[in-house]
Amino acid sequence: MNTGSRLAKNLSVRGNAVCGVGCYSAVIEKRDTDETVLKIGTTLDDPWLGYYQDVIVPLKGNPFLPKINHVREFFDCEDGYYIADMETLRPTVNTDLSDLCKEYVCGKVCSSELLSMCALREVENPDKLLSLLDKIIEQTDCFSYEDAEETLANISFEDSKFYRMIDLHDSNFMEREDGTLVIIDPWCNIDMSEVESLDSWWDEQRHG
């Protein structure tokens, strides 16, 4: 078990509520405030760090991006991990808009259709949503499992860590109290075979 995984599990044991768990990270509530949470990543190969560096920082202020106070990376003899301090969000109920985002990223609707549908839904700042989605598309290497398999056939496992596959499932959309949709994590690695996932631990905690 790597250091990041142990840290997330120890905080849970000490009574910090777990907001959510994914393959690479766990989001933990703070005891002293409900306005921000800690995102603990178990590996520095997590594509979310690329999202932070290549999208969140350049597009700072975009309302559809999570607000990040700081990200700190740590290295030890076993593996690297990171801790991000970020705003508290809630699961989205605005699935119409998140589905529209998925359709645009996958090429099923064009930009004019996206903007028209946003207008019908009275979405504020649709141009900023479009610019964010275009940035995600620009930074994505694979848009399907078929794309990933074809890419993997021509590169080494080590090189695969630098390739991003789109991963816009429902849990990667959240929202603020005012209902603003937030895209928290659009990518996964194209090769997940050696990822030490926290999902099994979280399932045991909830159902064991």
What are these regions (language model features)?
Residues 45-53, 94-100, 192-195:
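Active-site-adjacent loop/helix micro-motif of nuclease/hydrolase catalytic cores
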Residues 15-75:
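ATP-binding glycine-rich loop module of kinase domains
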Residues 82, 134-168, 175, 181-182:
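A generic "structured core" feature
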Residues 157-208:
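Catalytic activation segment of kinase domains across protein kinase-like and atypical kinase folds
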Residues 29-30, 88, 175:
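Conserved hydrophobic "DFG−1" position in protein kinase catalytic cores
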Residues 39-42, 88, 185-186:
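Residue-level recognition of conserved beta-strand positions in structured domain cores
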Residues 1-15, 137, 141:
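Juxta-kinase regulatory segment immediately upstream of eukaryotic protein kinase catalytic domains
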Residues 66-146:
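Conserved structural core of kinase catalytic domains
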